[in-house]
Amino acid sequence: MFWDKVAFAYDFFETVYNGKVYNRTGRQVADFIDESDVVLECACGTGAISQYIAPVCKKLIATDFSISMLKKARKKCRKHGNVTFRRADITHIRCRDERFDKAVAGNVIHLLPDPELALNELKRVVKPGGKIIIPTYINKESATASMAARLLEHLGAHFERQFNLETYKQFFADMGYKDVEITVVNGRMPCAIAIIEKKKREAIHKNSDQ
């Protein structure tokens, strides 16, 4: 699996090459988390954002499809006793409906062939009134960011889509999401953080596995 092979290099990218963006992104994501929250994080990677969520929530379930990524994430969060790590697929989340107060999925939407399936799953597992938090690279119009993306593609990554700020906003509109709040963290590879609140009247269309 590609992400297992490049976990070390990706960790370097997160903490060194694009460290300032990741640090600010982690802090901004944490600002949306309450101390009573039970949080699901999908595609946690090497724990760059997990380490900011863990200190401010009641419980964090951090998941990724890559075992090597999870190993690095565990090391980053080893001092926090409220974190559980699991291997999981964001497009098929094995838990009951409306379990979590918040769901976070960082820098994964642009990699998925069917992002709508992932968004539906995130909405399914979040409680009414809860929030879905989706930080995503917006590297389409930045020369430095595009170069980094090309390097990752050269190593074997596959980007299904690349965003700028306007196309990121349009992406959610096309998926039927209105009133999406978006903030941008600028840097070498900028990141846009989308916040979607699950309305209390929204129905759940998919049954859980448990």
Which residues are covered by each model-predicted region?
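A short glycine-rich, Lys/Arg-flanked "PGG" loop and its adjoining helix->strand segment in the class I
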Residues: 116-128
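Conserved class I S-adenosyl-L-methionine
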Residues: 1-34, 48, 72, 76, ...
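A short SAM/SAH-binding and catalytic strip from SAM-dependent methyltransferases
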Residues: 102-114
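C-terminal alpha-helical "lid/dimerization" subdomain adjacent to the S-adenosyl-L-methionine
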Residues: 13-16, 133-193
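A short acidic, Gly/Pro-enriched loop at the edge of an enzyme's catalytic core
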Residues: 91-103
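C-terminal lobe and adjacent flexible extensions of AdoMet/dcAdoMet transferase-like proteins
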Residues: 194-207
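Class I SAM-dependent methyltransferase SAM/SAH-binding core
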Residues: 40-92
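Glycine-centered, small-residue-biased loops immediately flanking beta-strands
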Residues: 37, 130
